[in-house]
Amino acid sequence: MLPLVALVGRPNVGKSTIFNALTRTRDALVHDQPGVTRDRNYGVCRLDEQQPFIVVDTGGIAGDEEGLAGATARQARAAAGEADLVLFVVDGREGASSLDDEILAWLRKLARPTVLVINKIDGTDEESVRSEFSRYGFSDVVALSAAHRQGIDDLLEEVGARLPEEGAGELLDNDPARVRIAFVGRPNVGKSTLVNRLLGEERMIASEVPGTTRDSIAVDLERDGRQYRLIDTAGLRRRGKVEEAVEKFSAFKTLQAIEQCQVAVLMLDATEGVTDQDATILGAILDAGRALVVAINKWDGQSDYQRAQAEDLLSRKLGFVNWAEAVRISALHGSGMRELFQAIHRAHASATHEFSTSEVNQALEIAYETNPPPSIRGHVSKLRYVHPGGANPPTFIVHGTRLKVLPESYKRYLENFFRKRFKLVGTPVRFIFREGANPYEGKKNPLSDRQIARKRRLMRHVKGK
């Protein structure tokens, strides 16, 4: 499972700014006014691709246990209780306060691994700021300015050194022969009903009440000689609808399930079409780079007209993931199950395929000769060679020159070309473009004796004029 890092501190010390810097998003609202963040906000930090982790932003602890402030403080304490590592954030400009002292006393009772993060050090004397907070007795201290992204790398290094390695938890299975499938979607789209149908038993509680499933539950299945691990997840609601603390933890567990699966099955309700929340869940799957199958549930109850309307809506709303197969199913009556598994197999095979360097270079050469990159302001990108960069999703690292001016349209052309050539379906495809450093940059080219003599003759000729 991905480890969890919690940001904790009093109001307006910059926790949300740090959250946005780590997750490379603007999901957390940032404002100078204290108390903007009230609920827990989960995201994934992938700044270090070798060690991703889930980070949770919390509301400021204001010392008031009543009303909204008290609820916010309880949310922050719950997040710290879940965390593998706590980042205790303080304000370097304002210095230590009595409220910081209270939070520190509570953190010591909690006995979680904790790193002191001094934010807003820009425009201050860093040494004097560190000296002021030295009375807290932390051996691990990171000073940064999140608003200017100064010190974020130092924070990542400190977090990486303190985090536990990913464990082979309940959802994660190291058996390479077993396919890990996560069923995700909004509440009450039929995820538990589908898993029960596949298992042939009432293993999951299925109800018409949205939010029946509160945790991610993993069960093993053998079907047609293949091994699977099915992960039934809690429905992800819009953030404004997520109220109970247990539901917030369910959302966190669902994000973990997406990160740890190999194939994500996004379930849609044919009676409701594609909603904004469906698009948000799809975004989480794409961010994780997971293979994708779209399962449209309750298809059997639709008329021909309703089906035509649903097909048109799908093509418009999900056109940007046209590489993912869409399967029409009925979890309640069992129709479409074979087609669903066939789509899962194709997506899994594409996502985990191992490419050789020779075959991808041959593909790049053909793509380059068929359609060379266009000239941009007199500059033409040169694609030298490519090599595989990993699987799930398939990643290709392209080396060349002037790649910074390579148009996005040409990058899409390469993606589509590789998809078609290698028959990749149901999986994102990533390209990483790297420019080689010029080994002669900054070096003077020494002239030979003959070149020196020629230069002198030219200079005499110029002076003679």
From Swiss-Prot:
Recorded GO MF terms: ATP hydrolysis activity; GTP binding; ribosome binding
A Pfam family it matches: MMR_HSR1
Residues covered by the KH-like domain: 353-437
Amino acids binding GTP 1: 9-16, 57-61, 119-122
Keywords: GTP-binding, Nucleotide-binding, Repeat, Ribosome biogenesis
Domain (EngA-type G) ranges: 3-167, 179-352
Function in brief: GTPase that plays an essential role in the late steps of ribosome biogenesis.
HAMAP family, per database record: GTPase_Der
Family of this protein: Belongs to the TRAFAC class TrmE-Era-EngA-EngB-Septin-like GTPase superfamily. EngA (Der) GTPase family.
Subunit structure: Associates with the 50S ribosomal subunit.
The name this protein goes by in its record: GTPase Der
Gene name linked to the record: der
